[in-house]
Structures are given as C-alpha cells and as structure tokens.
Amino acid sequence: MRIAVVSDTHLSAPSDWLERAYAQHLATADAVIHCGDMTGRSAWSYFLQHPCFHCVQGNMDDYQLAVDLPPRLDLELEGLKVAVCHGWGYKAGLSRRIYEAFGPDYDIIFFGHTHAREDSQFGKTRCINPGSLREGSLAIVTLDAGKISTEFVTL
C-alpha cells in the first residue's frame, strides 16, 4: 500500500502548485492522509476527489472546516494500527509527546504542526511528519507485509 502523507497546506483554495503536487504524487497513491492545517474548506474539497482521503483538524483551520474534521483518527491499514493527529505546542520534542499521549499500541502515528520532516521510532511505533506541503514537502509511506518505508519528497 502506497500512502501520500501531507500536512500544513495553509490554503483557503486550491492553487496551481497544489494541483501539480496532487497530479504528480497524490492521485496515484492508494490513500492520502492530511495531518491538519488544511486551512480552508475549498482546499479540503479539492482533496475529496481522492477515493481514500483522510484528514484531521489543525490549529489553523478555519472554524467552518474544523468543526467537520476530527481532532484525531484511528485507522487500520494493511493490518497496521495507525493514528493521525496534527500536533500541539512547542516543536521541540513533539514526536515524543505525541507518542506518550497515544501510547505504545500504534505501529505508525502521522502528525504535522512543526513543518519539519521527521521519521522517529519509539519502541515499535514510527512517528512520521511529512513536513509542510505549503513549503514543498510530503511523504510517501509504503506498507508491505508489515514493513514501513518512508520517502520524503521535495516539490
């Protein structure tokens, strides 16, 4: 399974660069996961064209969008237990705080907020931040027979 993971789009409406990124990297993914801070409903609606799109609310999403998005998601993908959240507070140590808040039962926790790429491991749990799509970063995460591989893409 090939998952395109994005975060921190910070767009009120789709843009040319978003449409290019979608066509080149997201459209062909088996799933698209957005870790929050989409910001506007029109941008969110653009992502809905993907048949397997998941999104959580971020701290910068406008109210009209945020009320329709969950603060976190729990998914099962390819037999792996996956959580998705945006993140909170200071950037330093965020992945550890998220891991401690969610607990050790997850195989993967996808998060955003810091605009910085990260692929950390705590026990059996991988904490993956794709960086900011607005700043030209996303992650392609491949799940294959219980193995997790991450490729960071610069747009």
Feature roles, as predicted:
Residues 52-90:
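Helix-adjacent hinge/juxtasegments
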Residues 18-20, 68-72, 93, 98-102:
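Charged helix-capping and loop-helix junction motifs
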Residues 5-7, 31-37, 54-59, 84-86, ...:
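Active-site neighborhood of phospho(di)ester-bond hydrolases with catalytic His/Asp-centered motifs
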Residues 6, 77-78, 101-106, 121-122, ...:
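Binuclear metal-dependent phosphoesterase catalytic core
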Residues 23, 45, 73-74, 100-101, ...:
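Short secondary-structure boundary/capping segments
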Residues 78-111:
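Mid-chain, well-packed structural core segment of small domains
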Residues 11-14, 39-43, 60-66, 89-94, ...:
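Active-site environment of divalent metal-dependent phosphoester hydrolases
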Residues 1-53, 61-70:
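N-terminal active-site segment of His-dependent metallophosphoesterases
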